[in-house]
Amino acid sequence: MNIMDYENSKRFRRNKLEEDNISDDEMENEEWDEGFGAEEFISFDEELPEYDENNPTPTCFSRWFDTQKYHYHRKIPLPIQLPKEDKKQPKQHPLKWAKFTDETEIESTMVVIGKIPLTRKRNVTNENVSFQGVANEIVVSKNIEGTKKKRNYAFTTYKNKNKKITKPIQNQLCFSITKGIECPHYSCTYIHNYSQIEHCQYNNQCRFALQVDDELYLQNNNGKCLKRHMYESIESYLLRLEIPIYNCTSLVLQVNPHVHSDCNILRRVLQNAKNCRVAPLIWQKKKVLELKTSDDSDSENNDEDDDWKIDLF
């Protein structure tokens, strides 16, 4: 029997059908991995690109994979893009805003952020002046139109401008001298030494300082001159301006005998010493150089210790 006759016979056809049925049953019983081992049953299209996990566009392989997922989970999975890692920016220097960098990076320009608000002018009409309230104050009632806060601006007070409050004049000595502490200023412009005080241009003719002795000045005309006058000692400067010094336990003044005998000068100097918190105040008489005989010199040496230093407290 020829091959052609055998293929056309009934026996060949029956065996062929049995082999096909067995192969179909084996295919159904086999467990295929998702995406692996199924290349023989998938027809890839050459025009479509290859499958990419990050690319959600469907390909031939992705369609087959979605159908397998649908039969397994009974739903079509949605494409998910994997999150990308954020690029870490370099940390800024914590003191970058304070310009603590190199000198080359410091900018010399000034930037102003903000806007100056414009002051609105209020139209005041129908002023009614009534002399009520305190004797030195005048109450003025105003009818302000076009504002919501009429009650706040309904009454304004004007004080009498003739009386002016005189502020106490402060001295220019630093706290490190008057209080005995460390200088609190970074670049101190106050005085740290008596020699740094500026000299008065009027010298002994200043109207706020009265010269009583060679080195002694008193306050005059209810005013204070913060400058140093001609031949004025530091003790006289502290008493005249009534500056308290922390470590000044006693103060010695060198005056002539006629100044010590004046009661008016003595009273004013003692009052300034109390305000300066100085105790005791010692008056020291100056020596007068004169030609004297030998008899007079012996009598003066006996009284020299009593008249040289006098404690007034």
UniProtKB/Swiss-Prot annotation:
One GO molecular-function entry: zinc ion binding
Short name of any one Pfam family annotated for the protein: Zn_finger_prot
Amino acid composition bias (Acidic residues), ranges on this chain: 296-313
Region (Disordered): 294-313
Record keywords: Metal-binding, Zinc, Zinc-finger
ZnF C3H1-type: positions: 174-199
Record protein name field: Putative zinc finger protein 077L
Organism: Invertebrate iridescent virus 6 (IIV-6)
